[in-house]
Amino acid sequence: MSTLDDIFGSSPPPTTHHAHPNPPTTTEPSDLPSLRRQHVTAGYRDGISASKTSHVQAGFDAGFPIGAQLGMRAGTILGILEGVLRGYDESQKAVVKKLPAGRKGATSTNGTATPTSTMTDEERQAKRAEILALYQQAVKELDVRKVFEGISEKEISGGEKAEVRLGRQGEGAIGKWEEKVRVPRWEENMDALEMKDTVTAEGTGVEVEES
C-alpha cells in the first residue's frame, strides 16, 4: 500500500457490470401547460370571431331585404290605423267648435231634424274605440317576435334557407293585416290625393307667373 493510499484511501475495486443510464424524464416545465391553454383559448376565440364575422354578414345580406320589406309593410298598416285615429280626434274637435255648448240638435235647410250632437258624438266615440282596439291588436300581432314565433330550429335546418322560411312566415302575418285594413284601397286614395296636390301646386304656380 502506498503513502497516497494512506492519505486518500484506496480506490474501490473495479466493477464488472456497466451502470444503466437514467431514463429520460417526461415531466414538462411547469409553465408549458399554462402556455398551451392560452394558445388554445386564443385560437378558439379567433376562430369564433372570424366565423361569426363571415356568417353574420352573410345572414345580414340574405335576411335584411326580406326583413326590411316586411317592416315597411307593417309600418304602412300601423300608419293607416294611426291616421284614422287622428282623423276621428280632429273631427271631434271640429264638431265641438262648430256647435254651441248645450245645443242638443239642429234643423237642416229642408226643415228635417238632423241627428243631435250627443248621438253623433256617441257614434264617433264608439267607432274610434273600435279602431283603437284594432290598432292595439295590430301593434301586438305585428311585433317582430310575434310574427316569427312558432318556427323551430328543426324547420329552419331542414334544407330550406332560413330567410325563405322566415319570409313566408312573415308574409302570412303581414298579408292578413293588409287584407283586414284594406291597404290597397288606402294606397290608391293616397296616390289620388298626391296627384291632386301636385296638379293644384302646378296650377298655383302658373297663376303666380301670369300675375
Swiss-Prot record:
Residues 11-26 have a biased composition (Pro residues). Keywords: Cytoplasm, Nucleus. Residues 43-83 are annotated as: deca-GX3 motif. PANTHER family: PROTEIN YAE1 HOMOLOG (PTHR18829:SF0). Belongs to the YAE1 family. Residues 1-35, 100-121 are annotated as: Disordered. This is Protein yae1. It holds the Pfam family Yae1_N. GO terms for cellular component: cytoplasm; nucleus.
